[in-house]
Amino acid sequence: MAGGGTTLEYTPTWVVALVCSVIVSISFAVERLIHRAGKHFKNNDQKQLFGALQKIKEELMLVGFISLLLSVGQSKIAKICISKELSEKFLPCTKPAGAEKSLKDSSHFQFSFTGRHLLAGDAPAGDYCSLKGKVPIMSLSALHELHIFIFVLAVAHIIFCLLTIVFGTMKIKQWKKWEDKVLEKDFDTDQSIKKFTHVQEHEFIRSRFLGVGKADASLGWVQSFMKQFLASVNESDYITMRLGFVTTHCKTNPKFNFHKYLMRALNSDFKKVVGISWYLWVFVVLFLLLNIVAWHVYFWLAFIPLILLLAVGTKLEHIITDLAHEVAEKHIAVEGDLVVRPSDDLFWFQSPRLVLFLIHFILFQNSFEIAYFFFILFQFGWDSCIMDHVKFVIPRLVIGVIIQLLCSYSTLPLYALVTQMGSSFKGAIFNEQTQEHLVGWAKMAKRGVKKGATQVGTSHDATSPRPSIQLNSLLGKGSSQQNQNPKEKSEIAHHD
């Protein structure tokens, strides 16, 4: 085909076989690697991480479908014609003189008919529209570059999420020594009741309570902002919040392994973070729409995840401060140990889950920034007009690195600990085997209720609570302390 290179009919068989074998080998190696990782997670009872791996496979499958649609529909898309005037509006770069003769100097959304042809059929598509006095809505070259960008974005998001969870987990594992110190104590209930704790002398209160009044409240926010950059969580914070959680949800088991629960809860949340949800794809589309020359959208966009991350980190730190203020303002001394009271009221819109949504968006936004930078760098070069001036590029890269480090070592560990201070606990409070038994039992109970198989079953449903609904709530969105009767709490408390 003219200008398109030789077809498969006239390509040496050894070339076809070689290229095919390399592509298949790489694909097979990646598939085996994912399979082995899944097998490892299953053998080690890490079902939350296995779920996250399944989510990654779903994302890769979605990218595969997008790739297939672009490949199959590219010739049809290239034959959609629009007026030349319309094609020159909302460009990411200013069109240089003689752009029709030089594809190299044009942007990836520019439409050219006489430049290089990445795929056979580019010229016919251009000729098809030029005969009508119009231009293709998108050239095959631009479609090919968009294809590459979507793939780079998905891979970058997965890699950055993995790095974040790995570094965050390393930080949380440092807290294990505090958990071990607590578990080594001899828990004597009578002794605990007899002792009194002077609130103002408690280390947690001394480090978090600054006083009462507007000036002290403002200073508390400043302290919370600064603390996320330093020691975001210290030993007194961890031990106090651990005691608050155990006292609220596992009162009969003071030796509940809170650290192990944190790790399970974090792994469970990870599979929600690693995916690219529909609203994130909407964000990508909006960015591609608004990436107009002279607007510098790419530069200003870099500040969104940074501002959100600082706001989330400050809020999480301030929740710890609020817990200290609540005790210090009400008590001079308390009987037994100092205990904080978890509550959803501490969080924005009374929703601890909102924090996970924001972290998800922050990680994706940062991944998008880095992926877009490297895509432009390798596809069009450093001098590309989309890359913009150096004064805009360097700050973006610096901000991206700061976000990645701060989110990994400060915000994510803070999230893992502080969100346990809500009114509800997560299904991760049970180990994986117990969760499976409970879910299975709940499903069986629910089917029994629906069928109404026997009169006894019907009578039981009419006179007693419906455990299936309670357990579904527990293992899905969590279950508040108030919704659990003492017997259920006792059973929960002995699972770590």
From Swiss-Prot:
Region ranges (Calmodulin-binding): 432-453
Residue segments, region Disordered: 454-496
Biased composition (Basic and acidic residues): 486-496
GO BP terms: defense response
Membrane topology type: Multi-pass membrane protein
Cytoplasmic side: 31-59, 169-269, 313-355, 419-496
Pfam families from the UniProt entry: Mlo
Domain of life: Eukaryota
GO MF terms, alphabetically ordered: calmodulin binding
Keywords: Calmodulin-binding, Membrane, Pathogenesis-related protein, Plant defense, Transmembrane, Transmembrane helix
Localization of this protein: Membrane
Membrane spanning residue stretches: 10-30, 60-80, 148-168, 270-290, 292-312, 356-376, 398-418
Notes on the domains: The C-terminus contains a calmodulin-binding domain, which binds calmodulin in a calcium-dependent fashion.
Function as written in the Swiss-Prot or TrEMBL entry: May be involved in modulation of pathogen defense and leaf cell death. Activity seems to be regulated by Ca(2+)-dependent calmodulin binding and seems not to require heterotrimeric G proteins.
Family classification: Belongs to the MLO family.
Descriptive protein name: MLO-like protein 15
Organism listed in the record: Arabidopsis thaliana
